[in-house]
Amino acid sequence: MEFVHIPVLLHEVLDGLAIRPDGIYVDGTVGGAGHSTEIAKRLTDGGRLIGFDRDPDAVAVATERLAPYPATVVHHNYDEMQTVLTEMGVVPVDGVLLDLGVSSHQLDEDSRGFSYHHDAPLDMRMSQTGMTAEELVNTVSEQELSRILYTYGEESFARSIARNIVRAREEKPIHRSEERRVGKECRSRWS
């Protein structure tokens, strides 16, 4: 699986963590293990890196890339960090990294449905569990769509966009990432 990850602000992250060779560090969003590999390279056998990710693709790639180092990758969201680390017996820790947002792998992998550049099923799930974006836009109420767009997308035109999505899905369900009719209807509002 192709999973390219160029870590952003790598030197700043390493400086900020002030890595001790025998320290315990957590990457709460391990992804392609770009940051984690560089952290783990600086650890001795007395140190440890624990990587978290809810994306099974990322867990598989990171596990392979971190195999030569004192590192463990777990398939959990970082919001479960305290519980998981306590169960592993590795608290307290010396540093935590969270590189938040959608990864380039998720954007580049057509089947994930995040890309605006490729036609794909409308998925947009980080962990491949739960409701897909297709199910969401075709089933939730206009009010709930508006709340989601406003809360998570910080979208000031959330009500208008939700209204247009509901109108569009009444004509024909929305299935693909490149179905532009909803965007075209909403764009006139911004023009």
PLM region spans:
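S-adenosyl-L-methionine-dependent methyltransferase catalytic core, i.e., the SAM/SAH-binding region
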Residues: 1-187
